[in-house]
Amino acid sequence: MELNAKPRKSQEKLAEGLIPAVAYNKDNNISFALDRKAFDRAFRQQSTTGLFDITVEGGETFPALVKTVQMDKRRRTPIHVDFYMVTYGEPIEVSVPVHTTGKSQGEIMGGLVDIVLHNLSIVAPGPRRIPQELTVDVSRLNIGDHITAGDVKLPEGCTLAVAADSVVISVLPPRMTADEAAAETQAAQVAGLVAAGELSEEAAAAVLEGDASIEEIKAEAHAAEGTQAEGSTEEGQQQ
């Protein structure tokens, strides 16, 4: 996509409707100004993976990718743009958005598809070979399954710039309700009391089935111990 720019000196006050921009690489640095509305429209179509051919009035035309866009927080409009100048035919590392397609088996069972890496770093063979997005089919994933960077199908000529075992997407188990979380906590507590010998298996079953609470079981056990102690005292006095 083409962008027309006006030359700009550092700290120069710009006319209404223009925003400052800079394009650079390891060997060059060019300052210029862009029409705010024209850039905003173009950027919405291209995003950070789209290639721009920038022509500076009275100067050269060069290819570049958007590096960063500074936005007006209140108006949500661009106020400054950094471009990275590239060279046709040379490999380039870029961060490409990851999108999913399909509905996973895990989702059908109540799970949640978690996109761990919303952008995947790859090396494209040249600026014109950069994909706008990477689409991943999640329809076969069950709860607990995941897709790594090595599983993602890349366009011909593109390679990963991250470890192949990096998790990109995973399917998480259903989120527990407050009641389910409380039940799980209680089960762990009961198991600990049984292991410590403070609760019998019969009493544990009663608690887990909702027939009694841990406090009630402990109170009954304490009362029984008190009754047993009183009986032992009476027997001693009779003797």
Swiss-Prot record:
Residues 217-239 are annotated as: Disordered. The keyword rRNA-binding applies. GO terms for molecular function: 5S rRNA binding; structural constituent of ribosome. InterPro entries: Rbsml_bL25/Gln-tRNA_synth_N, Ribosomal_bL25/Gln-tRNA_synth, Ribosomal_bL25_b-dom, Ribosomal_bL25_C, Ribosomal_bL25_long, Ribosomal_L25_dom, Ribosomal_uL5_bac-type. One of its GO terms (biological process) is translation. One of its GO terms (cellular component) is cytosolic large ribosomal subunit. The keyword Ribonucleoprotein applies. CDD domains: Ribosomal_L25_TL5_CTC. Pfam families: Ribosomal_L25p, Ribosomal_TL5_C. Part of the 50S ribosomal subunit; part of the 5S rRNA/L5/L18/L25 subcomplex. Contacts the 5S rRNA. Binds to the 5S rRNA independently of L5 and L18. This is one of the proteins that binds to the 5S RNA in the ribosome where it forms part of the central protuberance. This is Large ribosomal subunit protein bL25. It comes from Deinococcus deserti (strain DSM 17065 / CIP 109153 / LMG 22923 / VCD115).
